[in-house]
Amino acid sequence: MGDSSKKVKDSFDTISEPDSFDEPKGVPISMEPVFSTAAGIRIDVKQESIDKSKKMLNSDLKSKSSSKGGFSSPLVRKNNGSSAFVSPFRREGTSSTTTKRPASGGFEDFEAPPAKKSTSSSSKKSKKHSKKEKKKEFKEIHADVLRVSRIYEKDKFRIILQESSSTPLILATCSYNRGSDIKFGDRIHVDAEVCKKSSSGDVTEIYIDRVLKNKENGAKSGIRRHSIAKKPFCIKPRFIHELSDTKIKKTVVQVNLLDLNLDFYAGCSKCKHSLPEAANQCEFCKDSQGKSELSMYSRVRVMDFSGQMFINVTTKNMKKLLDLLGYEGFDNWFRFKDPQERQNYVFRPVMVEIEKSNDEWECTDVAEVDWKDFGSYLKHKEDKKKRRSKKKHP
């Protein structure tokens, strides 16, 4: 028993040595501040806390060597009957010394830059705001009317104007109520919003806000109706397959002639209905001034890359079409009906303006194709289609 008691006492003496706690004997505890590198976090440990912890541990161990109770943790100290945990990492004061370590691995103090805020949404809002606040430009314009076309699907009119012979053409848009009284050959004075200008600063596109004055047939003499085949297009050209949209009542298409059936008859010079040569008055229009004249009726089959269709052509526009094909004058019109003449017009390209009436398309104007303007329009249309596709499928 004496030997065992001596061994226990020697072991307690060994534990009581301050240098032997938690370290092999002879290895001193580092008194330098301890740093934890986990997740790049630095913890500054004050030397005062380490000294206090060391004294507390030594006193607990010495008191325990003479105590009969159970072994208590050296990190728990009794103070006035209550247990208090004393950490060697305790920091006094309210200031925090915990900071993130720089990416370079150094421990020097630094201030992290503030988080960057997304500027994409704010920039979009600022652009929209600037567009809304962009001051609209209004201008009073005096111009001749070179063409008027109704856009049924949008219930508005598109009008080609020209201020003078030396100025560029102006494409004007207006509501149905404002444009219903405007006709080809009028001279109008309007207050309009400027939509587009040329590189030289000339107005090229407007929206008519008010019609201040409309002088009927007041345009300068010698003006010609603007062609449906030239820019700016009063009605934008379409393809045949697009005409399945029932909202479209009037449009322009570039087609090739396939077949043409031409009939001559004596008709009223006013309403074009058939009229006997001996009649003094047309029973349809009741116009005593109506005279019997040679009239034509034709039904033409045409095509483009997207399909085929039939178009009815009245006398006025049939004469214009025959002139384009090289058949001028009364005698040549009759010769056109010969079967061998068909080779002169089959697959000939033309630009036609058509309007829907009683579920059939009727030609209201015809012109020779301007390939430069039409090609430029097709390129612009294709580019616009690609931009829309990119927005839908970025």
Swiss-Prot record:
Molecular function as annotated in GO: single-stranded DNA binding
Outcome of swapping residue 43 to A: Abolishes interaction with rad-51, but binding to ssDNA is retained. Loss of D-loop formation in the presence of rad-51. Loss of inhibition of ATP hydrolysis by rad-51
Region (Disordered): 1-30, 56-136
Gene name as annotated: brc-2
Source species of the chain: Caenorhabditis elegans
Tissue and organ expression note: Expressed in the germline, with highest expression in cells undergoing oogenesis.
Keywords, alphabetical: Cell cycle, Chromosome, DNA damage, DNA recombination, DNA repair, DNA-binding, Meiosis, Nucleus
UniProt feature, compositional bias: Basic and acidic residues: 1-12
Entry superkingdom: Eukaryota
Protein's name in the database: DNA repair protein brc-2
GO biological process, one term: embryo development ending in birth or egg hatching
Stretch list, region Interaction with rad-51: 1-60
Region named Required for ssDNA binding: 371-389
